[in-house]
UniProtKB/Swiss-Prot annotation:
It is found in: Nucleus; Cytoplasm. InterPro entries: PP2C, PP2C_BS, PPM-type-like_dom_sf, PPM-type_phosphatase-like_dom. Belongs to the PP2C family. Induction: Induced in shoots by drought in roots by abscisic acid (ABA), and both in roots and shoot by salt stress. Pfam families: PP2C (PF00481). The lineage of its organism: Eukaryota, Viridiplantae, Streptophyta, Embryophyta, Tracheophyta. SMART domains: PP2C_SIG, PP2Cc. This is Probable protein phosphatase 2C 27. Mn(2+) 1 binds at residues 128-129. GO terms for biological process: response to abscisic acid; response to salt stress; response to water deprivation. SUPFAM superfamilies: PP2C-like (SSF81606).
Amino acid sequence: MSMDFSPLLTVLEGDFNKDNTSSATEIDTLENLDDTRQISKGKPPRHLTSSATRLQLAANADVDVCNLVMKSLDDKSEFLPVYRSGSCAEQGAKQFMEDEHICIDDLVNHLGAAIQCSSLGAFYGVFDGHGGTDAAHFVRKNILRFIVEDSSFPLCVKKAIKSAFLKADYEFADDSSLDISSGTTALTAFIFGRRLIIANAGDCRAVLGRRGRAIELSKDHKPNCTAEKVRIEKLGGVVYDGYLNGQLSVARAIGDWHMKGPKGSACPLSPEPELQETDLSEDDEFLIMGCDGLWDVMSSQCAVTIARKELMIHNDPERCSRELVREALKRNTCDNLTVIVVCFSPDPPQRIEIRMQSRVRRSISAEGLNLLKGVLDGYP
């Protein structure tokens, strides 16, 4: 049976997650980030990427409706994101550069005849390597191919992404030309029309800028995080001084096969990503993806405040990514730095007005409070 998926329809797996919502409690939570940032090991130089395009989801595929959940996006909304990305990577204080990243604003042109969907969207990734460059380079080169070649793609994108992370881990181990003791975290963003799917394994982070608010779309997989520590100890691992088995500062990674058992066996160091999906709206202005070299020295809200201020001035995501890197270096980050900024509109963010309720008693909106917190976080 042939079906047409317009921008107002999307194909999902059954485990749909609702969009993030913000509250005063959430704002406080985002500001009280985990201060225990472990420094990864050592880091061959990088490049900048910047391009722009407008895309819209319209895919034809033979589907078994029993295996799909079709969710209508907001029928009243005519919003379609315009993908404009920029990136910046710097070696920083490290001896070597081990980060890799990828920015693809137009998947159709990039993949060509390799896929039968007439129009997909965009794909971005940040890969923070450690113990050498082999793992990060391998994942950057292959992860998108593993996703689109998976039998679940494009009908069950989340399943395909999870499978691709595991396949990348196994295929890396099988490549005799590579140092399989090297490893990498992996953070990817896959966009179909207005549907954004974030996958993360490690301590890179994706943050959505929503009218000045920072909405975290990924969790930092640190060994001393409660959920990760429980999982690690259940599988026979230990967390010592914030390090997995006293060796690694992340709880999830691709590679590092010197710390893993036979293929298919449960292991404290997991390559499995956590996924978060959301439907983009007019309020969603940009996405920041960065390695821990950025987040070690600034909060998510601070990064959003800086990015928004820069975009209001020049509306250039590449310059914006460079400014975030510059600010992190200014704050003496000890790690490699990689930042991607993806804008969802051709226009710059609009100024947010803070309205006072009265002369006697004044209040500030949640959006204004977020902006103020970002400024107080140390950005002039």
